[in-house]
Amino acid sequence: MEMVLFLVILTIAAFLLIELAYRMWSRRAKEKAGEAVPAMGITLPPVALPEFRLPGGFFYHSGHTWAHLTPSGEAQIGIDDFAQGVIGKIDRIDLPRPGTLLRQGEKAFSVVQGMKKIDFVSPVDGIVNAANDDVNADTGRIGKDPYQASWFLAVMPTNITQNIKKLRIAKDAANWLERELMVFLEFITLHRATPAEVGITMQDGGHCIEGVMEKIDGELLQLLVRKFFR
């Protein structure tokens, strides 16, 4: 039975990788031909992956955090749709106090689920002005929309001009997330995760992103964290 389940997940992952590769090739071909291609939003096969929200006006870090510049000059930061999908249920968010100095690419806050924890890096350098306590009062709101009102920290940037050079926006962000999904599927296949671990279910229309953190722990979880959230 375990061998059958393993073959099922390998087959699903193979088809998804082929589909994603075709989509990326098609996008590049259209760009070279001068055709318009959508810059935002990624719709993938509903059996396997959700449609990821990727709103415009946000700068995305490779560690799956984002920064949004406000009219006041602050940068609100939070986690992207990929991250909240992988985590699933969130019990609490450990946020730094106002006045804390953040560095781009270094730990900014932690998302906790039971005894598990993922440390997320800051997308920008800056000083914390405020922490959004509302997200801890209602962590479910992050799953509904990880952007806009679900920001975690308000930061006064100290090096935004240089920081932005290492972030992604618009079409660049959409292309990056497509590649990231391919890497994620390869990661699952490489480590031989079972359908029970990653939530792939052909019958109920599940997908291999949502709530992965709820289903794995130990070394596999640490490998996932190092691969996608640094």
What would you call each of these model-derived segments?
Residues 1-230:
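Contiguous, well-folded functional domains in the mature portion of proteins
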